[in-house]
């Protein structure tokens, strides 16, 4: 069993964040009081492995410099963490294609730009 609160804290810690960095919990249509949401998360245990999805698929957490959304594949669930203010390159590079013919390749890999700036 996975505890939703513990899972959330673990993901935050991996990214050097804490519960104190959370600014919003809910969905794009529903805001939940943060303290009440955290208390409910502490009481929420679920099977994160394969099977049926148990946690709301539109649950999200927005915080200082990040957003977390629920990921799911075939019933397996997790938090997706995305930095909202990433340090991005300032130098433009020539790109010839967005499409890969090898599958699961990066923009840099498709355009032979690995390791450069």
Regions of interest found by a model, annotated:
Residues 1-117:
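Acidic interaction surfaces
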């Amino acid at each position: 069993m996975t505890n939703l609160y513990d899972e959330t804290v673990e993901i935050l810690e991996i990214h050097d964040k804490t519960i104190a960095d959370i600014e919003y919990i809910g969905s794009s249509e529903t805001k939940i009081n943060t303290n009440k949401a955290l208390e409910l998360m502490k009481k929420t245990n679920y099977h994160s492995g394969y099977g049926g999805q148990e946690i709301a698929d539109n649950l999200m957490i927005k915080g200082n410099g990040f957003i977390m959304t629920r990921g799911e594949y075939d019933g397996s669930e997790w938090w997706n963490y995305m930095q909202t203010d990433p340090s991005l390159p300032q130098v433009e590079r020539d790109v010839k294609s967005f499409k890969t013919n090898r599958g699961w390749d990066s923009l840099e890999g498709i355009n032979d730009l690995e390791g450069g700036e």
